[in-house]
Amino acid sequence: MARKSSILKVQGVVDAIRKQLDDRLAIDRRAMDVFRWALGCLLVLEFGGRMMVAEGLLSDQGVFPFEIWQTFPHATWPWFSSILALSSSTLWVHVCLSCGMVCSLMLIFGKQLRWVSWALLILLHSLQARNPWTNYAADKLLFLLLFWACFVFAVQPDENSRATRWMGFPAWGLRLQLCVLYLFSVARKSGSTWVEGSAVRYALEIDQYSQPLGKWLLEGPMIWLQMLTWITLLVEWFGPLMLLARSVRIRWMGVASLAFLQLGFLLTMDLGWFPWVCLLGLLPHVPLSHRKEEIQPLEMNVHAWGMSTRVAGWMVLWMLLWNLAMNFTYPDTLKSRLPSVLSRGIECLRMDQYWGMFSPNPMIHDGWFVIAATLSDGEVVDLLDPTRKEVWAKPLHVPATFPGDRWREFMMMLYDYPDQAHLWPLVAKWFQHRWEQAHPGQSGVRSMRVVYMMEKTLPEGVASPEKEQLWPEDPSGQGSSEPGDG
């Protein structure tokens, strides 16, 4: 009897704690509806945007053909986990992306949420797995938000239900995901630039990301940049904590502060989808319900989908423990100690999280690419950005030289992994083909070379750029002598 009484007491304490967390981490039903709509819109744009670069980055006609994908040593996920592996044609890629857009529209209109959300998750994984070097932090966060939403949609209330909040482990995961990103990211910002207040200045000097407004800020007093650095740290530390507060006013303060932080990123840096996905992740935190008499937890559907809820609970626990472990090690190190099946599983579910944006310090080496082509008439053009008159001069806006953020990410990853330099000829020939299509009847390309103009950010100013030739066409590796080659 004493043992049974002790078990009941422990169970009572656990239930009380869970009830408190349920109340604190519940999601307002109307906020969830807005989140679903925004998630669907973002996925429509994501699948549509990928369709624009499908031929170049996702098919055999581009820079990452199927035979390279099958043996790619830096693949995050096995090639056979993607339904895009069923065919290497551009048409099949377009069919899959079109299916993703249709499912995204169904998500927007709330049709068949339980199976549509999982179908979207499979399609999104297949897309991201097809060319892992086109993904960045925004893609992992988008996948994770959709992942948690799949569990939430499995516990959806009936149309006639008076329930106004979503409770349970699925809601916990969706609420905690963004908080985990901010808290563990800022915990790694321990470098000297963050302490002394120069981190924002170094970040804005990164040509691959900097926007005109960011360049303008660099011309202002250093005290501005120091204040922005410390404000960023404060918001990333206290913003997510305010999101977890019980007080509606404090939660609104957390939502507003983190939203303004992302708007600042949008105005000063070209980070692709990342600010938009972070803004999407804020929507489940919006507190809209005030009248307690209307609150009816979704317990009736939690029991109906008990297995799904329990799986979500274990995944929440894994997410927290994994991110805590990442303060002492790195994902690849820890995964190498796990059984391969478990390691592959957490990779496919994006549970091998590591949020290290601009940590411990922003990078100090950056620059821009030049695909220099000498035409048959002797003229030299940059195939990456043919509109530029001075091939070797620094572009006014480096992000605009790329056809899009996916190409920028792919080329930067290719630069970071010299063992894959054999892909540079495919990149050069792709841009040659694009240039010849846009300029029919003009002089043909006689020779090409891919050059990276590397700059180093110094404590004061920026060093002169250094040319680093990544791919010469001729066997000697010297490239051709061209005007402006200093």
Locate each region found by the language model.
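Alpha-helical membrane-anchoring segments
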Residues: 2-486
